[in-house]
């Protein structure tokens, strides 16, 4: 059952705001991974490639951390993750 914003407590509204921010951050991390991967394909310098590969791994860690936070704040989303993982 969905609720209108008028029926939500300040705490529920704050959680929704936090979730919106976290989801936007998640999008940013995924876009960064894609961008670094594209750059790797264009780079010729091996040190630069290695550095970007390392950065991609860090970005993937950020994705995992954000997904965990989102699941903690959104039980319905957590349930969806459980169904597909």
Predicted regions and their residues:
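Iron-associated oxidoreductase/ferritin-like identity signal
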Residues: 1-85
């Amino acid at each position: 059952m969905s609720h209108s914003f008028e029926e939500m407590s300040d705490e529920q509204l704050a959680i929704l705001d936090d979730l919106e921010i976290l989801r936007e951050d998640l999008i940013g991390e995924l876009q960064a991974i894609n961008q670094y991967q594209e750059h790797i394909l264009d780079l010729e310098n091996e040190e630069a490639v290695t550095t970007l590969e390392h950065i991609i791994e860090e970005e993937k860690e950020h994705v995992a951390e954000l997904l965990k936070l989102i699941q903690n704040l959104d039980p319905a989303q957590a349930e969806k993750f459980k169904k597909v993982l």
